[in-house]
């Protein structure tokens, strides 16, 4: 072939290849642009659907926790949670707390707790054995998680508190201020809705466990007056965070502190602490109109600490070893009662659950079930009740549950701080096991040395 023709032929082929390549690139660009336009259009069209779904879910999420069901029949207690807060706090950022308690909505269970405005293993943890200070706040986190700045929600300023969910929003009751004039601040959905002023000017205090909600109304019990003598006790009925009714108990020779309350068949039962002169626990039950009955658990299986050895009980205050006490709970089933108590009779150590089939009304000390929760060689502390409503569990009854505070540090151990972790159990009508679920932290910490 002529050299010039060869050059022309090769040039023509290269030009054709270049034109084809250019057309392919233009086609690719057009394809990408069309595809992007379609995706953008679909995205904009999907947004109203997404928002509609979100709003629908929010609407469905609001219910009324009726509280009209009876407590579920149970044969024992299944482990529900353990937060290991002190163990984790030796290395991680965990709050110094006390008075933890659990409450459940129809969607979730949360651990509420009173912080000391300090973290474990930090200088501000020094001296945190004090109950009432302006630094204490009520916070909450998902149940079973160690309470830290990263997973906790601020609720209110408080050194005594309660909280519960009515099916629409959380209600918090938070007491703070001076001993001679404290005020309880009520918040509903995080907004201040009402206040309650100390009426005896002597350390207004409340449950340190969940309030009880029935048919959209929530109920709590408060105490004002001496911790070692006759005080004043009131039941409050609240709706959407506002007090709509209250009644003062006519209860001479009774002492009610730190009540553990739960709904049962449309009414509320509270089992409390007698810090004056009872080693058995006082109770108050009331309907939605605040018509009430009062008494003491009659069983010879005594529930407070300190307490005498089990023996013959009393349907009034059992005065032997009756002074002082610890927050606790029981669940009434007809004439029978599940009693939660420390294993030790004179220190806050160990924990057990006992079923006394005649203990609500009978004074003998016979029981048929004992389930170990914490060994007597390990520290316990406060304990209290909470429930899971049918709207959460899908059951046709209210599930009884309880939590146990596992106190560590001062005054029993060589630390500069006092704090605790917690465990919880729920009642089931199936197989359970007794064991020991202690706090398990190795003390002292670095800050203590």
UniProtKB/Swiss-Prot annotation:
Q: Where's it mainly located?
A: virion
Q: Where in the cell is it found?
A: Virion membrane; Host apical cell membrane
Where, in residue ranges, is this chain on the Intravirion side? 1-6
Which residue stretches belong to region Involved in apical transport and lipid raft association? 11-33
Where, in this chain's numbering, is substrate bound? 98, 132, 257-258, 273, 348
Q: Alphabetically, which GO biological process terms does the record hold?
A: carbohydrate metabolic process; viral budding from plasma membrane
Q: Which terms in the Gene Ontology molecular function aspect does this entry carry? A: exo-alpha-sialidase activity; metal ion binding
Q: Which reactions fall under this protein's catalytic activity? A: Hydrolysis of alpha-(2->3)-, alpha-(2->6)-, alpha-(2->8)- glycosidic linkages of terminal sialic acid residues in oligosaccharides, glycoproteins, glycolipids, colominic acid and synthetic substrates
UniProt enzyme class: hydrolase
User: Which UniProt keywords are given for this protein, alphabetically ordered?
Assistant: Calcium, Disulfide bond, Glycoprotein, Glycosidase, Host cell membrane, Host membrane, Hydrolase, Membrane, Metal-binding, Signal-anchor, Transmembrane, Transmembrane helix, Virion
Q: What cofactor is this protein dependent on?
A: Ca(2+)
What is its membrane topology?
A: Single-pass type II membrane protein
- What ranges does the Virion surface topological domain annotation cover? 28-449
> What does the entry report regarding how activity is regulated?
Inhibited by the neuraminidase inhibitors zanamivir (Relenza) and oseltamivir (Tamiflu). These drugs interfere with the release of progeny virus from infected cells and are effective against all influenza strains. Resistance to neuraminidase inhibitors is quite rare.
Disulphide bridges in this chain? 72-397, 104-109, 164-211, 213-218, 259-272, 261-270, 298-315, 401-426
Which superkingdom, per the lineage?
Answer: Viruses
**Protein residues bound to Ca(2+):** 274, 278, 304
Could you tell me which residues belong to the region Hypervariable stalk region? 36-70
Q: Which residues form the active site?
A: 131, 382
Q: Does the keyword Nucleus apply?
A: no
Q: Which residues are glycosylated?
A: 68, 126, 215, 366
What is stated as this protein's family in its record? Belongs to the glycosyl hydrolase 34 family.
How this chain assembles, per its entry, is: Homotetramer.
Domain remarks in the Swiss-Prot or TrEMBL record? Intact N-terminus is essential for virion morphogenesis. Possesses two apical sorting signals, one in the ectodomain, which is likely to be a glycan, and the other in the transmembrane domain. The transmembrane domain also plays a role in lipid raft association.
Q: What is this protein's function?
A: Catalyzes the removal of terminal sialic acid residues from viral and cellular glycoconjugates. Cleaves off the terminal sialic acids on the glycosylated HA during virus budding to facilitate virus release. Additionally helps virus spread through the circulation by further removing sialic acids from the cell surface. These cleavages prevent self-aggregation and ensure the efficient spread of the progeny virus from cell to cell. Otherwise, infection would be limited to one round of replication.
Q: What is this protein called?
A: Neuraminidase
Organism per entry = Influenza A virus (strain A/Chicken/Hong Kong/37.4/2002 H5N1 genotype X2)
- Gene behind the chain: NA
């Amino acid at each position: 072939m002529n050299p010039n023709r060869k050059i022309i032929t090769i040039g023509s082929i290269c030009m054709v290849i270049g034109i084809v390549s250019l057309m392919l690139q233009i086609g690719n660009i057009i394809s990408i642009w069309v595809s992007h336009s379609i995706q953008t259009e679909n995205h904009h069209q999907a947004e109203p659907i997404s928002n509609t779904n979100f709003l629908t879910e929010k609407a469905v999420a609001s219910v009324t926790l009726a509280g009209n069901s009876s407590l579920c029949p149970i044969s024992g207690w299944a482990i529900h949670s353990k937060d290991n807060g002190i163990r984790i706090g030796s290395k991680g950022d965990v709050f110094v707390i006390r008075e933890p308690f659990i409450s459940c909505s129809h969607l979730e269970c949360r651990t509420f707790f009173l912080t000391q405005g300090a973290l474990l293993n930090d200088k501000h943890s020094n001296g945190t054995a004090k109950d009432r200070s302006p630094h204490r706040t009520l916070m909450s986190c998902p149940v079973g998680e160690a309470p830290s700045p990263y997973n906790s929600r601020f609720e209110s300023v408080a050194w005594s508190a309660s909280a519960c969910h009515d099916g629409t929003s959380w209600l918090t009751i938070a007491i703070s201020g001076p001993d001679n004039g404290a005020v309880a601040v009520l918040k509903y959905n995080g907004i201040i809705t009402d206040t309650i002023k100390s009426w005896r000017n002597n350390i207004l205090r409340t449950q340190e466990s969940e309030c009880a909600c029935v048919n959209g109304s929530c109920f709590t019990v408060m105490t004002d007056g001496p911790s070692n003598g006759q005080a004043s006790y009131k039941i409050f009925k609240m709706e959407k965070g506002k007090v709509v009714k209250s009644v003062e108990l006519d209860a001479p020779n009774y002492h009610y502190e730190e009540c553990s309350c739960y709904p049962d068949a449309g009414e509320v039962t509270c089992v409390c602490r007698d810090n004056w002169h009872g080693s058995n626990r006082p109770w108050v039950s009331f309907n939605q109109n605040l018509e009430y009955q009062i008494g003491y658990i009659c069983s010879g299986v005594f529930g407070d600490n300190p307490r005498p050895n089990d023996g013959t009980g009393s349907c009034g205050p059992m005065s032997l070893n009756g002074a002082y006490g610890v927050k606790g709970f029981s669940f009434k089933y007809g004439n029978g009662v599940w009693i939660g108590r420390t294993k030790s009779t004179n220190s806050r150590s160990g924990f057990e659950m006992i079923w006394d089939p005649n203990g609500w009304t009978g004074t003998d000390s016979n029981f048929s079930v004992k389930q170990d929760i914490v060994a007597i060689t390990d520290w316990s502390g406060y304990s209290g009740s909470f429930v899971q409503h049918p709207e959460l569990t899908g059951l046709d009854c209210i599930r009884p549950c309880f939590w146990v505070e596992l106190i560590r540090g001062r005054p029993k151990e060589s630390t500069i701080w006092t704090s605790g972790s917690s465990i919880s159990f729920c009642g089931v009508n199936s197989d359970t096991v007794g064991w020991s679920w202690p706090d398990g932290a190795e003390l002292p910490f670095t800050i203590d040395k």
